[in-house]
Every structure is written in C-alpha cells, then in structure tokens.
Amino acid sequence: MSTSKFLFFTLISVILKEITCDIICFNAEEERIEQHLATKTPYRVVANTNDEKVTFDECFPTRAWGIFRHGTRNPSRKQIFRIKTTLTQYRDIILEKGEFCDRDLERFRTWNFQLDDDEQKFLVPEGEDELIELAERIQNRFPDLFFDQYDNSTYKFKYTDTQRAKKSAESFATGLFGRHNIKQIWYPKAEKKDPILRFYKGCPRWKSEVDKNPDAMEQVRLFAASDHFLQLLKNLRSKTGIEDLSADDVHLMYTTCAFETAWDRHIISPWCSLFTRESVKIMEFLEDLEYYWIDGFGYDLTYRQACPAGRNMFEHLDPYSKLPNITLYFTHSGTLLKYLAFLGLYRDQKPLVHTSFGGEHSWRPSKIDAFASNLLFVTFSCPTGAKVLSMHQERPVTIPGCPDDTPLCDYAVFAEAFRERVESCDFDKMCTIS
C-alpha cells in the first residue's frame, strides 16, 4: 500500500472513531441527567441560593413551622445487595460487549461499589451539607426570627426514629447555631409511628387500599408496557450487550445513577451513561406516576390522612399560640408528598396517567421532592393583622384559596382554606379498615 493510501485510510479511521465517540460518549453537562432523578434528585438542583433578607413593609416575622425531608442518603439494604451483585455482573458484560466510547468504558472499569448493609439508608456527607446550607440560608432570610442562639422556649426540633432524619436535624441545627453549640439542643423521643411526622405509618386502611393495592400501580405497569419504555429497553439491551436485560434491571441502573450523582457533584456515575436527556425522562415519568398514585392525588385518603399534621401546623402558626415560636420537623418523602397534596399544591387539572407522557404536568418529584425538600410557613405580624408566608423549596408558593398577587396571605383566609379539612379530621375513623 502506498504511503498516501495508508495516510488516507488512517485519517478516515480517525474521523470515524471521533464521530463514533461524539455519538456514544456521555456528556453530563449536555444531558443534565441530574434534573430528572425523581426523589433521588440532589437538593442542589432545586435549591434557591438567593438568601437575601425577606421583608414586607411594616411587617415582622413572629412564628414558623416547617417540614424537612432528610438529605441525601444511601440506598436500602435490598438495593445495596442488588447493586453489588447484579450490577457488578452487568458491568463485566458491558466491558466485554457494550457499545460505549473508551472514556465511558473506563468509568465502568474503575467503578467499585463498597457500601455495607449496615450503612443502608444512612445520611451521607452531601446530605449533611444540604441541611447545613439550607439552615444558613433560612437564617439569612429571617434573621429576626431564626436567632443563632438556641433556646428551647423558642425552638422545637423533632425527627423520626431513623438515622437519616436524626442526622438531618442535627445538621440543620449546626447551620443555625454552629457545630460547637448543638449538644445543648433538646429533642423529644423519636417515634416509629409518629402521628405527625409519619402519620401514614398508623393508617392501616391506606396501607391496604393504596400502598399494598396492586391497582395503585396500574398506570406504572401500563407505561412500562408502552412503546416509549419498550423502545428504551430494546436500545439498552443493544447498547449494553445484555440480551435479557429486564425493566427491573433498567430501574436499578437508573437508581444507581441517581444515588451516585446525588452523593458527589464532581463524579459522573457510569450508570448515567446509559441514558440520554430524552430517555431519562421516560424513567422519570415512571416515578412521577408511582408517587402520584401512592403518595399524591391518586386516592383521596392518601392526602386526607395528613390532617393531623395540618392541625399541628395551625396550632403552632396561630399568632396567639403559646407554643415555641419555631417548630421544625425532619421526616421523609412519604410525609412531604402527602402534605403537599393535602395543601393542594401541584395538582394537575386531570389525573396523571400513562398517556400523559410528553405533556406538561406539575406533579414532578424531581422538582417537588428532591433530597432535603422542605416546606416552611412563617407568620407575620402586620398593621392589618396576621399574615402567612408559604414557602416550598425556599420559594414563595400560593396556597389554593389565598390570593396569587401577593406572597402574604391573611391568616384568617389561610385558616379558612383548611378549616373543613382540619375540623373534620377524624384520623382513627378514616384509617380504620371496615
């Protein structure tokens, strides 16, 4: 072969290789996978970093009540086992047969999952930082209410009986008072079935009719059988070289991508390279459907059972209340989502169903229930009477029934919006299996 022909074919092979790499290589900045990780989305994606002082003419904050989801955590024991076994086997197949560029293959080659079972669901350093920084920003917004000196007549903290909620509360306290001052904080004894922080744990009827009801997952099953998901499954079987790749396997890969993305903003999980901006939306929508029907508006009982938390909110926000000025609860996704629905937030005009994919919808856990998601209500004393500021993810939100042209809602109007739901709250009756 002549030198010119050799150079020509060499150039062609280099060009083809570059084109192939451009097509296959995962680009984290371009795909923005981290915005579509449902309840495993890191809080940094949704956080409001503008922490300027919140002021309203002639008004000053007097009381606050908040619900905080724990920060970024480890997977469950079952997930840890499957990641260490199933995904390790699949990683080896991908290295042998997968259609990935060299850079992505190298990420699989160096991937090493080291978690032990006894670390299941533990809060991780990123989760601690989420709560510390969140507390600092809230304190900056309301310095005249969230004082940096702890007093148990002013502050009330409570968490569920889990390591991740306890550590989240301690991290939040660190952000408010400093690392050397948190030992003086008093916490009430944590309860496994806390009637406010985890009300659904004490609702047998919800467990039977919703949580354990196969019909509640019908829309998820229908979407998993749709052309959208089946094409994704087909593409991933081809890309990975795993011929018998199942829907559960794909979900495990998506979940692992989510956890590893949430843990460290500087590291790209190899499992994220299986997805594109479009295909990850398919995985996200499966989660949207599940959390809509299990924890959202799918069944009335799901959010009606949150009424004890609603009653507690008004007991603490009441401008004449003698309870501590600031009440902070540290809990879980299941509580936050149900309470969002109880408040009437993010309700779409039509129920979310499998055919809703591709359209706009408000119920998106990636945005409303990321790790460390939060709801905060602040009572203000104003010349015209008490008013309430409602905030979700550190931004003002309009509660249905309140005016949408101002962040502040008259306390009387705010209370009236929930009066029927709170006054008729008979938790034991609604949760009894008849």
Predicted regions and their residues:
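Cleavable N-terminal signal peptides of Sec/SRP-targeted secreted and luminal proteins
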Residues: 3-21
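A positional/structural detector of protein chain ends, strongest at the extreme C-terminus
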Residues: 1-3, 433-434
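Signature for phosphate-centric chemistry
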Residues: 21-156, 160-434
